[in-house]
Amino acid sequence: MKFFDAMPIHRRLILFLLAVLALTCVISPWLALGADWLATHWPALLSERIPFSRVFNRAFMISGVVLFILLRRYFIDGRIKELIAVRFAVASRDLFTGLGLAVGSMILLAVAMTVTGIFTPFMRASLSHALERFFTAMMAGISVGALEELFFRGILFKGLHDQGNRLRAYIAANLFYSVLHFVKPGEDYFLDGTLPLAGFPHLISAFSPFLDPLPLLPGIFGLFIIGLVLSYALVRTGNLYLGIGLHGGWVFSLKTMRVFGNFTREDLGWAFGATDPKIVSGVATWLSILLVGVAVHFLTRKRADRSADSLHAKAV
């Protein structure tokens, strides 16, 4: 695969994603057929049929993991390893700094929503349930943060950044990151019989939200700003851990916010999100994310020149 070796790493990522999607479309109908067989013949193992959208999502995860294991040497090169293999003290400091900034910004947003009557604070769950929710949310936050930071910042953004056009890197990588979050499968339905090509129309239907793009714009913009801050964290520190902490902290906070209260209405307004994803699509959230970016700037000011020089040296 000499052509793959000569290809810039961010282009390898695009081809990898296309390959994962193609493999998902091929195997998902057969996985759905197998799941239906289990539900029919072994109800003790699988009590009910699984909608095809869920099967497709699991097939995507399986395809991604398998192909990444097989092709990992084309993505995890020396430059990527240097973003991960840092001293434990540095990694832990950056990780917990990111977590603190992200959770702190979400607490401030929750206070603002409480003051404006959008959020009512109260303890909705028992202590044991709350602790269980915290644990699962933290595991989800760290795993999602680590994977997305590796792919979108470590590979895609850094690949573009290393080519010298930094503005293009910030815009292209994070626009791709934000738009990709709105590629969603259609409504739940079940496959009847063997339909070997069912995965391909299902994939096409996942792009249906873009037929009405205007409601998506606030959410896309909010995720774009998040991507900018996470990319800036990579440039300022020269590693992925501050970004993983920020990313994981935001995911953790969103998943646990309703443990401590509930929203008083469905539409959170222009300040906190009138469209999905709620909160991320709100103007107040955009400002809080930018403030986190400012905090990243000042907290890393003693390391910034050294990290920038290091990134530039690795790109040459």
Where are these regions (language model features)?
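Alpha-helical transmembrane segments and their helix-entry boundary regions
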Residues: 83, 94-95, 155, 169-170, ...
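Residue-level signature of the transmembrane alpha-helical core
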Residues: 95, 99, 103, 138, ...
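Membrane-interface helix/loop boundary segments of multi-pass membrane proteins
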Residues: 147-179, 183-197, 235-239
